[in-house]
């Protein structure tokens, strides 16, 4: 029996003056069903960019926020692609946090896509925190499992995770 643990998921995206805030909201909501987004002011680093965003949309929750993303990654058969990009760039050295970006335009039509780098009008940023490296490993086994020819070798459940 697994001990229960918490997963914290934070999703945010800068909204630029040329963007429709409703479309950015939809792009996030398509991948993260049930997320409640708040409008937040910019931090100092963002407001110093050449083209400055107007504000940032941010939402937080638990594992439940990842269920839609979990299904879409499988529907699009991109587990390997996403896992390779996330592991190679986004996992913290202590293994408690993973950070990755998702393309806003692809998200708008329900396709999770990790851009090669930060996009000119920003990306959707996803930050996932766990209490231990073992918990992060279990999360990866569930969200981005090892595959054979693109099909998960084993699908694990996450029923031992506290619901935020």
From Swiss-Prot:
Pfam families: RNA_binding. InterPro entries: PAB1135-like, Ribosomal_uL5_dom_sf. Transmembrane segments: none annotated. Belongs to the UPF0201 family. This is UPF0201 protein MA_4659. It comes from Methanosarcina acetivorans (strain ATCC 35395 / DSM 2834 / JCM 12185 / C2A).
């Amino acid at each position: 029996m697994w001990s229960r643990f918490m997963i914290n998921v934070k999703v945010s995206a800068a909204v630029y003056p040329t963007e429709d805030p409703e479309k950015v909201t939809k792009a996030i909501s398509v991948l993260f069903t049930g997320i409640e987004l708040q409008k937040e002011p910019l931090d100092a680093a963002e407001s110093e960019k050449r083209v400055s965003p107007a504000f940032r949309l941010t939402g937080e929750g638990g594992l439940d926020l990842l269920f839609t993303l979990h299904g879409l990654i499988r529907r699009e058969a991109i587990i390997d692609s996403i896992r390779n990009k996330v592991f190679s760039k986004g996992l913290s050295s202590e293994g408690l946090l993973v950070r990755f970006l998702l393309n806003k335009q692809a998200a708008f039509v329900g396709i999770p896509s990790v851009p090669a780098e930060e996009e000119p009008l920003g990306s959707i940023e996803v930050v996932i925190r766990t209490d231990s490296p073992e918990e992060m490993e279990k999360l990866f086994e569930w969200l981005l499992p090892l595959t054979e020819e693109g099909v998960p070798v084993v699908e694990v459940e996450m029923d031992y995770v506290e619901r935020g």
